[in-house]
Swiss-Prot record:
Binding site for Ca(2+) 1: D20, T24, K26, E31
SMART domains: EFh
Disulfide bonds: none
Organism: Drosophila melanogaster
GO molecular function: calcium ion binding; enzyme regulator activity; myosin VI head/neck binding
Cellular component, GO annotation: cytoplasm; investment cone; myosin VI complex; nucleus
Binding site for Ca(2+) 4: D129, D131, D133, M135, E140
Family: Belongs to the calmodulin family.
GO biological process, one term: actin filament-based movement
Role: May be involved in calcium-mediated signal transduction.
Phylogenetic placement of the source organism: Eukaryota, Metazoa, Ecdysozoa, Arthropoda, Hexapoda
Protein name: Calmodulin-related protein 97A
Keywords from the named record: Calcium, Metal-binding, Repeat
SUPFAM superfamilies: EF-hand
Residues that coordinate or bind Ca(2+) 2: N58, N60, Q62, E67
Length: 148
């Protein structure tokens, strides 16, 4: 829990206690999604199942506060990473159409001080262009960045 601030832990505790109606120090795993949403997180059902499987130590359908804080820390890290990826994508997607064209990629690379040929730009696009449209969409961009 060292990556969480004291304020975050206190906020999580307040919310956790509201869901711990019997005062056992535990919540039912089925309540996790609702609890997380009250704290501004919006995990998908699949993400919830993965988070529960990772955090639940004794597989009894309940989470204690420490397990819950671990889940929240992980979810917040992933949310931060997602936001950073979207911001990076926007830098490349200069016209905001949701795609990085060869011209946009070339512009950014040159502004970063990279000397790249048209062939190198085309190769970079080809490596990540899974749908074959000649441009890089957000999902392809994330894949490309995660390969580096």
């Amino acid at each position: 829990m060292s990556e969480l601030t004291e304020e975050q832990i206190a906020e999580f505790k307040d919310a956790f206690v509201q869901f711990d109606k019997e005062g056992t120090g535990k919540i039912a795993t089925r309540e996790l999604g609702t609890l997380m949403r009250t704290l501004g997180q919006n995990p998908t059902e699949a993400e919830l199942q993965d988070l529960i499987a990772e955090a639940e130590n004794n597989n009894n359908g309940q989470l204690n506060f420490t397990e819950f804080c671990g889940i929240m820390a992980k979810q917040m890290r992933e949310t931060d990473t997602e936001e950073e990826m979207r911001e990076a994508f926007k830098i490349f997607d200069r016209d905001g159409d949701g795609f990085i064209s060869p011209a946009e990629l070339r512009f950014v690379m040159i502004n970063l001080g990279e000397k790249v040929t048209d062939e190198e730009i085309d190769e970079m696009i080809r490596e990540a262009d899974f749908d074959g449209d000649g441009m890089i969409n957000y999902e392809e961009f994330v894949w490309m960045i995660s390969q580096k």
